[in-house]
């Protein structure tokens, strides 16, 4: 099968067909280009997706990736990044091995096609020229033959006419002979041109056109083969990255199999374990029996020798407000909301054995008053986060991490010690290097001046000493915490028993539960006595504030036991300091022994105000 023999007369159709073939090739090139753009865009989107979910440095997200599930997710993100890289490889290989190669081949193909069809048109024009010469020779031969016939007929007519002179007859004969010769010459020329045309025509249809069409056929077949090879390359480019993509997927599977739910659960314990023991049982509070309260100086002195009783008067406030100084807390509160009780009817205090009772006051007013200082929270959590909650709002973290639970504090301190030790080791290595360099300079002065290293060596030595002092400080705190952790169960039980005696359940829960719902914590100092549970770290924030000054004195006219929150018990005849006079609500704020503060009914005391203090 040959286009030269089978399609010898389809020159124009072959020209259209070969142009269509080039268009198909260019269409395939465009397809591959768009595929490479898709691969690049897909790879870019995958990389952006992987980058988007990568943990940010020095953020809370980075700490979350200690869990195996998060580590597996991080591995998945990294594998997806490599996966995106393989799609970039696909794009690059398709561009270099297919697109660029085919574009160059298309240019060569267009040039070859143009040359072949140029040769075809040239041969076609040549045969057309030969045909025109043949037609011209044929017409000339035909014309000469006709003129020769007419000249012969004219001669015969003149020769037969007796009236024509002999000269005219001779002239007609000569003219006929000339025309006859011209016809013979035209015949010979026509014959020669015809023979030549036939030769050219045979060569055109049997040599030139078959050769040209054969070249065009081979060109077209090469184009078809080339596009097939490009399609194979297209598949091979994809196949080459399949093993690497498979490894990426295997990496994701391996990361998924590395997830350990038990390990993650243990990490949660390590991250949030406080080191405390659960609170003890709450004792039954029998309201049918009268509560015993200390109302005399003798009971006050006796309570110092032994374990103090739990009272609702001034002494009990050390238990009610374990995290705040007395004067600071009381400065936040107003006088009791209900009116004070009237003085007893009997002039003698002994006529009223138990003294007048101030009206029962619900627990809610105190919470309302305390809300002036704190945001609205459930009463059971009223004082849990008072210390650290304020420090968090102020953005302040104690250097010794005392706002963390014991276990978490120990981990923070241990981490700080490890960091300092690493810095010390780094500075020590630098000092050793400088020392060695100085020794080299001493042995070989031409290499450098040893004195030039003295200042640097001094700075490094000072840094090491500073870091060691810092490390010793944190190691001391760490030793303190580690020494305190084993005894925390006994301490927790002691504190639980201490606050179980309180009748105010809200305050009891606040004292036992040190951790607020938002995770803040106030650490207890185990060295403090049982009857005075305070938070020194929180107290330090108010050390710069002085207690309210006394503006006068007062003498108790009647005994007042002060059962309600915010009140203080007094004994008839007792002298106390006045720190806030009656605001018109019937209550006067007093202080006893620079330690206890509270409100008493104004009618129960006789007030002697200091004029200078009042005026100021």
Swiss-Prot record:
| SH3 domain ranges (all copies) | 549-610
Q: Which residues carry this modification: Phosphoserine?
A: 296, 299, 348, 358, 496, 520
Q: State the superkingdom.
A: Eukaryota
Q: In which residue ranges is the amino acid composition biased (Pro residues)? A: 337-346
Q: Which SUPFAM superfamilies would you find in this protein's record?
A: BAR/IMD domain-like, SH3-domain
Instruction: Identify the stretch(es) annotated as Interaction with PDE6G.
Output: 494-616
In terms of SMART domains, this protein maps to: FCH, SH3
Q: Where is the composition biased (Polar residues)?
A: 502-511
Domain description: The F-BAR domain binds the phospholipid membrane with its concave surface. The end-to-end polymerization of dimers of these domains provides a curved surface that fits best membranes with around 600 A diameter, and may drive tubulation.
Protein name from the UniProt record? Formin-binding protein 1
């Amino acid at each position: 099968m040959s286009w030269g023999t089978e399609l010898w007369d389809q020159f124009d159709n072959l020209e259209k067909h070969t142009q269509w073939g080039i268009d198909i090739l260019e269409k395939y090139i465009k397809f591959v280009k768009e595929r490479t753009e898709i691969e690049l865009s897909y790879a870019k989107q995958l990389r952006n997706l992987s980058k988007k979910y990568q943990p940010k440095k020095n953020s809370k997200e980075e700490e979350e990736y200690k869990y195996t599930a998060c580590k597996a997710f991080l591995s998945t993100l990294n594998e997806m990044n490599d996966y995106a890289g393989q799609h970039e490889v696909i794009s690059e290989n398709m561009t270099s091995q297919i697109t660029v190669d085919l574009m160059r081949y298309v240019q060569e193909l267009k040039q070859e096609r143009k040359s072949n069809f140029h040769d075809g048109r040239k041969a076609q024009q040549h045969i057309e020229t030969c045909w025109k010469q043949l037609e011209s020779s044929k017409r000339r031969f035909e014309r000469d033959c006709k003129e020769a016939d007419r000249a012969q007929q004219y001669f015969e007519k003149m020769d037969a006419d007796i009236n024509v002179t002999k000269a005219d007859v001779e002239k007609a004969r000569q003219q006929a002979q000339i025309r006859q010769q011209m016809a013979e010459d035209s015949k010979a020329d026509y014959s020669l041109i015809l023979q030549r045309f036939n030769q050219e025509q045979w060569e055109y249809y049997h040599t030139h056109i078959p050769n040209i069409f054969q070249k065009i056929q081979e060109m077209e077949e090469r184009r078809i083969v080339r596009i097939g090879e490009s399609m194979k390359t297209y598949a091979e480019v994809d196949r080459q990255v399949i093993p690497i993509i498979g490894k990426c997927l295997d990496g994701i599977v391996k990361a998924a199999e590395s997830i350990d739910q038990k390990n993650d659960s243990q990490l949660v314990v390590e991250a949030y374990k406080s080191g405390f023991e659960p609170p003890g049982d709450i004792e039954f509070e029998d309201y049918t029996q009268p509560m015993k309260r200390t109302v005399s100086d003798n009971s006050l002195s006796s309570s110092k020798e032994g374990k103090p009783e739990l009272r609702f008067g001034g002494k009990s406030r050390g238990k009610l407000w374990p995290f705040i100084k007395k004067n600071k807390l009381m400065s936040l509160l107003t006088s009791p909301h209900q009116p004070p009780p009237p003085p007893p009817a009997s002039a003698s205090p002994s006529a009223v054995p138990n003294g007048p009772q101030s009206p029962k006051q619900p627990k809610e007013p105190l919470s309302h008053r305390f809300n002036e200082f704190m945001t609205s929270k459930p009463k059971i959590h009223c004082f849990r986060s008072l210390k650290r909650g304020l420090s968090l709002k102020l953005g302040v973290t104690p250097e010794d991490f005392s706002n963390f639970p014991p276990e978490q504090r120990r981990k923070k301190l241990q981490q700080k010690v490890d960091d300092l030790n690493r810095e010390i080791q780094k500075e020590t290595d630098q000092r050793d290097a400088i020392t060695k360099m100085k020794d080299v300079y001493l042995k070989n002065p031409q290499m450098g001046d040893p004195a030039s290293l003295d200042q640097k060596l001094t700075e490094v030595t000072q840094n090491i000493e500073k870091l060691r002092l810092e490390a010793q400080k944190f190691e001391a705190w760490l030793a303190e915490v580690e020494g305190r952790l084993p005894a925390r169960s006994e301490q927790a039980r002691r504190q639980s028993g201490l606050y179980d005696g309180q009748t105010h359940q809200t305050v009891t829960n606040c004292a036992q539960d040190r951790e607020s719902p938002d995770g803040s914590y106030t650490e207890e100092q185990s060295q403090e006595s049982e009857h005075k549970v305070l938070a020194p770290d929180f107290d330090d924030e108010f050390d710069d504030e002085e207690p309210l000054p006394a503006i006068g004195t007062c003498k108790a006219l009647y005994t007042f036991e002060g059962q309600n929150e915010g009140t203080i018990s007094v004994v008839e005849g007792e002298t106390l300091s006045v720190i806030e006079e009656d605001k018109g609500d019937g209550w006067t704020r007093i202080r006893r022994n620079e330690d206890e503060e509270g409100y008493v009914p104004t009618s129960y005391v006789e007030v002697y105000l200091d004029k200078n203090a009042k005026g100021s």
